[in-house]
C-alpha cells in the first residue's frame, strides 16, 4: 500500500512509536573513548574510528530500514545538518571523506535487524548501530548472560528517528472506522 495512491484514502494517521537509531557501544569501550562523560557528536565517533579505536556492526543500508535511516542520519550530520541534502552536499569532499572514514569502522553488516541482534549477541563485537529498542533488547540478553552491556550514544548533532504510524484505510465502512478508532485509542493509551 502506498499512501500517495490517488484511489486510496488514508485517514486518522497517528504515530504509535518513535524509535531513534543509536550507537550501542560496550560500556568499557565507551568509557575508554570518553563518551560517557560528555556530549558526543558524530565527528567524535568518526575520529575514534579514524584512530583505530572503534569498530561497529549495523544492518545493511540497502536492505533494511534501520541501516538506511542510520546512513541518512550520518549523511545529514556530517554534512552539517542542511535543511535539504542537495547534490552539492553529496559532492563535498569533506563529507565524502568523513563518511568513508566512518564506514571503515564497519566490521560486520547484516540483512535484517533480527539477524544483527543475533550476530552481536553471538559474536565479539564492541559496538552496534541499530534501533534504540534493539539496544534495550540486546542489553537485556547480555545481562541475562552475565556479559557487559552497551552504552547508548545519541549524537547531539543528529539522530535518525524511525516512526510507526497507524492509519485507517477508508473503505466507507463507518462501523469499521469506529472499531479502528477504538483500537488506535487503546494502543495510544497508557494501558496499550
PLM segments and residue spans:
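Ligand-binding pocket segment of bilobal, Venus flytrap-like solute-binding proteins
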Residues: 76, 81-154
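N-terminal segment of the mature folded domain
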Residues: 1-63
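Solvent-exposed loop/turn segments at secondary-structure junctions
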Residues: 1, 29-31, 61-66, 133-136, ...
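Extracytoplasmic/secreted proteins, especially bacterial periplasmic and envelope-associated proteins
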Residues: 3, 40, 44, 65-69, ...
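Periplasmic-binding protein-like
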Residues: 15-23, 49, 62, 96-102, 110, 143-172, 186-192, ...
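Short helix-loop capping/hinge motifs at secondary-structure junctions, enriched
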Residues: 28-37, 76-85, 172-180
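Extracytoplasmic/periplasmic solute-binding protein
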Residues: 52-80
Amino acid at each position: 500500500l502506498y499512501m500517495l495512491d490517488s484511489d486510496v484514502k488514508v485517514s486518522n494517521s497517528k504515530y504509535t512509536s518513535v524509535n531513534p537509531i543509536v550507537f550501542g557501544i560496550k560500556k568499557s569501550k565507551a568509557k575508554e573513548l570518553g563518551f560517557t562523560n560528555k556530549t558526543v557528536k558524530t565527528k567524535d565517533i568518526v575520529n575514534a574510528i579514524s584512530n583505530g579505536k572503534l569498530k561497529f556492526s549495523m544492518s545493511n543500508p540497502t536492505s533494511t530500514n534501520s541501516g538506511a535511516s542510520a546512513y541518512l542520519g550520518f549523511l545529514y550530520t556530517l554534512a552539517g545538518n542542511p535543511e535539504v541534502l542537495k547534490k552539492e552536499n553529496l559532492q563535498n569532499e569533506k563529507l565524502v571523506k568523513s563518511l568513508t572514514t566512518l564506514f571503515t569502522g564497519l566490521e560486520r553488516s547484516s540483512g535484517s535487524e533480527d539477524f544483527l541482534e543475533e550476530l552481536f549477541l553471538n559474536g565479539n563485537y564492541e559496538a552496534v548501530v541499530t534501533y534504540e529498542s534493539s539496544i534495550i533488547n540486546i542489553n537485556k540478553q547480555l545481562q541475562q548472560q552475565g556479559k557487559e552491556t552497551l552504552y547508548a550514544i545519541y549524537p547531539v548533532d543528529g539522530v535518525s528517528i524511525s516512526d510507526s504510524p497507524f492509519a485507517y484505510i477508508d473503505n466507507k465502512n463507518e462501523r469499521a472506522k469506529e472499531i479502528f478508532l477504538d483500537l488506535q485509542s487503546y494502543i495510544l493509551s497508557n494501558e496499550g
